[in-house]
């Protein structure tokens, strides 16, 4: 009788979650983009924290099914495209996504946030304010990245240009990591962003629970120093610097996850030999004081071969499993797979294969979630609304027309929501309750 009662409790809780999200998904199908204060609720909006190898929110585990949309600040800076930002949040929320990732930088380029060192465009900053305020309305938290490794949106190359314009004689983009002037430029930007008071909510960024985490850099690499020492020194300095300004928020590096010299036995998991030569070192980098969780990206089409094949799925599984194991054995922290996807530009691409990629990533995440492991979630690259095709890099998932992908994403959200709502820290390793069998039965279904 107790087992039956336990099953009923689990079932009723799960059904409530499912019905709530199914109604939201129906709203997505009808392309209704309206929201009001009643639909988003007014309950307390708290910071996500970390406890051991898991994220927590109000004492409960917080597993992530999320998305990337890097361009939100840029489109929010123009009233004619600002509505696309709202559409992204509405559509992501409708399939149960709770965390997004976007840029809190645009250095010296079109619609630049930072036009030159410490000189900002207030209208673009207000656009970032808007992004955060809209995210809060839809109960979505954001990982904000603070600079790019790549030239897009300025990146470390723009900082080097600024340095040379100020009279320095810099010859490599990697001077970004070592030159004191450029380090000061970066720290000034970090200080400005963290101390920004949102013009829509009147909340200082460093006090805003809408921000899930600060990301030091998108995909940092320092190929001029394969030993990894230069990048390690930069990470050590900047992680402590961010924490000195904001001890409340989580901090992560923004790594792709490549293994380096400190763990030669793990380099066999790298996608290619070059990955060990780019100056990053997954385990060593994440052992730095001030880093709260590890990030990993998953791009077999960029790293292995542009031609779609089942080897992509095999690599994805082994790559994710290796990093979950490392997070548990060596780091003692959560690992979040903050970017993954497959491009429509790849030879042999079809939407069915993209759906298989989604299922593979979600299965690996759920395998860790079931046992209370370090695999804390994933964020697909990337969610797009209709009408933003001109920003599409090939990886866009249009939720209103990719119906199978939307259902897969929604199902993952429902499964993780069951854990988030039913688990507590009294059952630390994966909800080991008497009703675990009933819970496993629910999670094994392809439809909820």
UniProtKB/Swiss-Prot annotation:
Leader sequence residues: 1-26
Tissue specificity as recorded in UniProt: Ubiquitous.
Single annotated GO MF: mannan endo-1,4-beta-mannosidase activity
EC number: 3.2.1.78
Catalytic activity: Random hydrolysis of (1->4)-beta-D-mannosidic linkages in mannans, galactomannans and glucomannans
Active-site residues, as the UniProt record annotates them: 219, 339
Sequence positions that bind substrate: 103, 218, 299, 381
CC per GO annotation: extracellular region
Subcellular locations according to the entry: Secreted
Top-level taxonomic group: Eukaryota
Primary enzyme class: hydrolase
Positions glycosylated per UniProt: 79, 164, 169, 202, 350, 367, 435
Keywords in alphabetical order: Glycoprotein, Glycosidase, Hydrolase, Secreted, Signal
Keyword Transmembrane helix: no
PROSITE patterns: ER_TARGET (PS00014)
A GO BP entry: seed germination
Family: Belongs to the glycosyl hydrolase 5 (cellulase A) family.
Name of protein: Mannan endo-1,4-beta-mannosidase 6
Gene giving rise to this polypeptide: MAN6
């Amino acid at each position: 009788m107790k087992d039956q009662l336990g099953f009923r409790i689990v079932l009723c809780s799960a059904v409530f979650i499912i019905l709530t999200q199914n109604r939201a998904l129906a709203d997505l199908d009808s392309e209704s983009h309206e929201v009001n204060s009643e639909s988003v609720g007014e309950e307390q909006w708290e910071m996500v924290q970390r406890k051991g190898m898991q994220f927590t929110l109000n004492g409960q585990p917080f597993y992530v099914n999320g998305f990337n949309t890097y361009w939100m600040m840029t489109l929010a800076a123009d009233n004619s495209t600002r509505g696309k930002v709202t559409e992204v949040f509405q559509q992501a929320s409708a399939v149960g996504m709770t965390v997004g990732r976007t840029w809190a930088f645009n250095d010296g380029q079109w619609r630049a946030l930072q036009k030159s060192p410490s000189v900002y465009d207030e209208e673009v900053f207000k656009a970032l304010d808007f992004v955060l305020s809209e995210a809060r309305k839809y109960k979505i938290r954001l990982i904000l990245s603070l600079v790019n490794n790549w030239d897009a949106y300025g990146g470390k190359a723009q900082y080097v240009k600024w340095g040379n314009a100020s009279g320095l004689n810099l010859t490599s983009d990697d001077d970004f990591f070592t030159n004191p002037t450029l380090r000061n430029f970066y720290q000034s930007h970090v200080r400005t962003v963290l101390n920004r008071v949102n013009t829509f909510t009147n909340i200082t960024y460093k006090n805003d629970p809408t921000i899930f985490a600060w990301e030091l850099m998108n995909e940092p690499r320092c190929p001029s120093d394969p030993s990894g020492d230069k990048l390690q020194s930069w990470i050590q300095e900047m992680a402590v610097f961010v924490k000195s300004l904001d001890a409340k928020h989580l901090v992560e590096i923004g790594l792709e996850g490549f293994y380096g010299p400190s763990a030669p036995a793990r380099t066999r998991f790298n996608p290619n030999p070059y990955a060990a030569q780019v100056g990053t070192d997954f385990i060593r980098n994440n052992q730095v004081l001030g880093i709260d969780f590890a990030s990993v990206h998953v791009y077999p089409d960029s790293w292995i071969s542009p031609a779609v094949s089942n080897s992509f799925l095999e690599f994805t599984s082994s790559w994710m499993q290796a990093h979950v194991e490392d997070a548990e054995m060596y780091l003692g922290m959560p690992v979040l797979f903050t970017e993954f996807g497959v491009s429509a530009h790849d030879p042999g691409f079809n939407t069915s294969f993209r759906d298989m990629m989604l299922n593979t990533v979600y299965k690996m995440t759920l395998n860790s979630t079931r046992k209370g492991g370090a695999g804390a979630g994933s964020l697909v690259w990337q969610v797009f609304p209709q009408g933003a095709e001109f920003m599409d890099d090939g990886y866009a998932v249009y939720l209103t027309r990719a119906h199978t992908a939307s259902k897969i994403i929604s199902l993952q959200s429902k499964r993780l929501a069951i854990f988030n709502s039913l688990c507590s820290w009294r059952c630390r390793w994966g909800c080991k309750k008497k009703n675990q069998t009933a819970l496993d039965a629910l999670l094994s279904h392809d439809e909820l």
